[in-house]
Regions:
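Short glycine-biased active-site loop of nucleotidyltransferases that positions the nucleotide triphosphate
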Residues: 51, 126-128
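Glycine-rich, often proline-containing surface loops adjacent to acidic residues and nearby aromatics
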Residues: 129-135
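Basic helix-turn-helix/winged-helix DNA-binding cores
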Residues: 1-69
């Protein structure tokens, strides 16, 4: 079996070349997102082909965009199939999701600023007045 493993990269080598941590690579193996090319039967070491480094870099990039794992899985599958347009569409959809989230967060920040500026009692009184249940 040792001859079959020649030329493969260790998980540490892939981690260094891709920017992913060893822990992340193990996780992506467990969730079947980025499987090693082989696992050494004696040591249990995960081993990767050199072309898997580029795939690991793509996973790292997509996760850095806060893409959920299932969307990463979809984008990686499209990329491996040579379908760059589908990868772009996944990213565009995620951007729209993030934009909506940022809008919600800006609203929350505005309400926090109002609360801090006016004080809790004043804000609660405003809420009672606007809901028609002033005491």
């Amino acid at each position: 079996m040792q001859g079959d493993l020649a030329g493969l990269l260790t998980i540490g080598q892939v981690a260094r070349r891709s920017g992913l941590s060893v822990k992340a690579l193990r996780h992506y193996d467990r969730v079947q997102l980025l499987r090693p090319a082989a696992v050494d039967g004696g040591s249990g070491y995960r081993l990767y082909r050199s072309d898997q480094v580029e795939e690991a870099r793509l996973v790292h990039l997509l996760r850095s965009l806060d893409l959920p794992l299932e969307q990463v899985r979809t984008a990686v599958a499209a990329w491996k199939a040579g379908d760059g347009e589908s990868v772009s569409e996944v990213i565009r959809l995620h951007r729209r999701h993030l934009d909506a989230r940022v809008t919600r967060l800006r609203g929350a920040l505005h309400r926090i600023d109002h609360l801090l500026a006016e004080g809790l009692d004043a804000v609660m009184t405003d809420l009672d007045t606007t809901s028609g249940t002033a005491t």
